[in-house]
Amino acid sequence: MGKRYFCDYCDRSFQDNLHNRKKHLNGLQHLKAKKVWYDMFRDAAAILLDEQNKRPCRKFLLTGQCDFGSNCRFSHMSEQDLQELSVQVEEERRAREWPLETAELPEGHLEDWLEKRAKRLSSAPSSRAEPIRTTVFQYPVGWPPMQELPPSLRAPPPGGWSVLSKVQWG
């Protein structure tokens, strides 16, 4: 059995040979599915420009649905939809032009914050007055005894590892 080609746009597969693939890629269903896929990623400005240049779809206005769907040559948007879309386009344009105005910046500067933090820490009761609790290291349940573990899995000694100055590797 030969290889199969799976088309992500159409969500279907077929035997992969030059004739079948070319026939599928030039087919109306594939072209429509591909257009729908790429239309999902269009920005509001491009959609608004296209919809403003189209006349209203008579069948969509009368029945509320159109057989052509997103491939219709006419617009399925009402005047209110177009107005909302133009407001969205304007908001996106403003956000690109003035990114600092829309972003919430904290008031004050880093120096002010550091001063406040230093005052808060100095006025707060010292947490160092409390005795430091040392956690006792325990091996996980089910592990073999410490003597049987390789050195990489053993806990370090209480004083840490000794540093040897003249160590030769290799």
Swiss-Prot record:
Listed GO MF terms: zinc ion binding
Residue spans, zinc finger C3H1-type: 51-79
Biological process terms from the Gene Ontology for this record are:
mRNA processing; RNA splicing
| Pfam families named among the record's database cross-references | zf-CCCH (PF00642), zf-U1 (PF06220)
Q: Which residues form a coiled coil?
A: none
Which subcellular locations apply to this protein? Nucleus
Q: List the disulfide bonds.
A: none
Looking up SMART domains in the UniProt record yields: ZnF_C3H1 (SM00356)
User: What Gene Ontology cellular component terms go with this record?
Assistant: nucleoplasm; U12-type spliceosomal complex
Tell whether Zinc-finger is among the UniProt keywords. Answer: yes
Q: Which domain of life is it from?
A: Eukaryota
Keyword set, alphabetical order: Metal-binding, mRNA processing, mRNA splicing, Nucleus, Spliceosome, Zinc, Zinc-finger
PANTHER family found in the cross-reference section = NUCLEASE-RELATED, ZINC FINGER MATRIN-TYPE PROTEIN 5
Subunit-level organization: Component of the U11/U12 snRNPs that are part of the U12-type spliceosome. Not found in the major spliceosome.
Q: What protein name is recorded for this chain?
A: Zinc finger matrin-type protein 5
List the taxonomic lineage. Answer: Eukaryota, Metazoa, Chordata, Craniata, Vertebrata
